Amino acid sequence: MRVAILNDTHWGARNDSLAFLEYFHKFYDNIFFPYLEKNNIRTVIHLGDIVDRRKFINYIILNRFKTDFIYKLKKMGIDFHVIIGNHDVPYRNTNKINAMQELFGTDSGTWYPKFYSEARDINLGGTDLCLIPWINNSNYTASLQLSLIHISEPTRLAT
């Protein structure tokens, strides 16, 4: 299984600069998406800070983020995972409210993309991964405990 890794994309960077937005768009359309197709990569993991501003998002940026990135990944059949980063949450002490949940959450509990606001283990294609989002007061103990399990028993998944 091949996986593409992205991080710190900061959609809306530089005060929602449209010049930066166009630059990012060229990267995704001319390099990233063709690379996924050419190399038959079906899974993408984003390591956090998918958006730039902690408190709000510009509607133009949001529209382009959804149409040029999220919906394109979905249309390509990409299994997309997002680990919540510090720029993805408005509060420093909790991940409970986060950009991905607010933008893409549904009442039915189905999510695209999949996002992780708490530390947890997942298995992708037979490979175990420990995902740890932005660590803060509300998840510090659980994140530390999961990390210590993997340090003491690196081949064991936490239950």
Residue ranges and their predicted role:
Residues 1-4, 121-131:
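Beta-strand-turn-beta hairpins that frame and shape the catalytic cleft
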Residues 133-139:
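Short beta->alpha connector loops
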Residues 140-148:
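Short amphipathic alpha-helix with an adjacent loop that forms part of the alpha/beta core around
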